[in-house]
């Protein structure tokens, strides 16, 4: 009797006695076929079916997969927060989780959204007024621009900067102000007072600029970007003054790459005069250099005749350039080799660079057709004949009167 009470209904017993239910393919079920889902997805006959039922099943599967992934991510984040709370306490754990990016911090616009939406119109009107006043004030000198940039940096360091400091501190906005002063829109403002038509024209012309200003981040982020540019310049050029680097950056429109190129060009021009890194770096010269076009390339000013190997190093010349003597620089040029100790000749210059993979210019290859670099004319036509012709007085009395090149090349008469 007790066994009959503990036994369930016959229908449930019949279902429990059979094998457990296995998942079936929904696409096959839509088309009247029952097939187990395990190992069947790749070989399903209706895996690419686009009927209404199969499309609905595919959409449900996609939504379910997204929900499972989201729940899994949320569970992982909750576990991490719980571990941090156990390690550091409740408040410290939440702060550390927000700092590490586990919990996204609440943005500021959610707290101050209503206040910013209410004061949007007032800020736009104030921006128009400050913009027009900044344009009518006239172009500023480099010293004033440097002072304004310094004041803008000091004001924007805590994150609270005034609109005037913001407009006066950036070089790109100063350039826009100069172009705006030269535009015909600002002429009625200079001649007469501010009329409603002029104000509306200013608003219509500069509406895109105001939209850009509204879309830009806060002035503190702009100031931090400017500070990053100044820090980059000070690290690249530690020997230059910070004020000069600020002026160069402001003259180049906050473009760090252009400022670096400008400083390198000016320092290269000063290096020829043997001047120090800070000598001649005046604000006027820097601003003039930033506005002037770059100097023409050296190839345009080069003479038509090939340059002498002694005039510059052989590393930037072709290996097939003719050899010409440069006697004042023979001793100082690192690409010369003293061969006169054995052959009674002045030091011969290499046709290839000393550190390259070329062969040294040796005397057995100087005849026509054997010398690899000068094989088109006889040796007398080349300009290095006087190099061979000038022999030292020390070896004149030795047995090399005929020389390796004959009496005509050596410009001496054979001794009888």
Curated annotation (Swiss-Prot):
Sequence segments annotated as region (Disordered): 131-226
Query: Gene3D superfamilies in the record, alphabetically?
Result: DM DNA-binding domain, DNA helicase RuvA subunit, C-terminal domain
- GO cellular component terms, semicolon-separated: nucleus
- Where in this chain does the record put each DMA domain? 227-262
Q: Where is the composition biased (Polar residues)?
A: 131-154
* One Pfam match: DMRT5_DMB
Question: Which keywords does UniProt give here?
Answer: DNA-binding, Metal-binding, Nucleus, Zinc
Q: Where is the composition biased (Low complexity)?
A: 197-207
Keyword Metal-binding attributed: yes
Q: Return the annotated DNA-binding positions.
A: 25-72
What the protein does? Answer: May be involved in sexual development.
Name listed for the protein in its UniProt record: Doublesex- and mab-3-related transcription factor A2
Q: What organism is listed for this UniProt entry?
A: Takifugu rubripes
Q: What is the lineage of its organism?
A: Eukaryota, Metazoa, Chordata, Craniata, Vertebrata
- Please state the gene responsible for encoding this protein: dmrta2
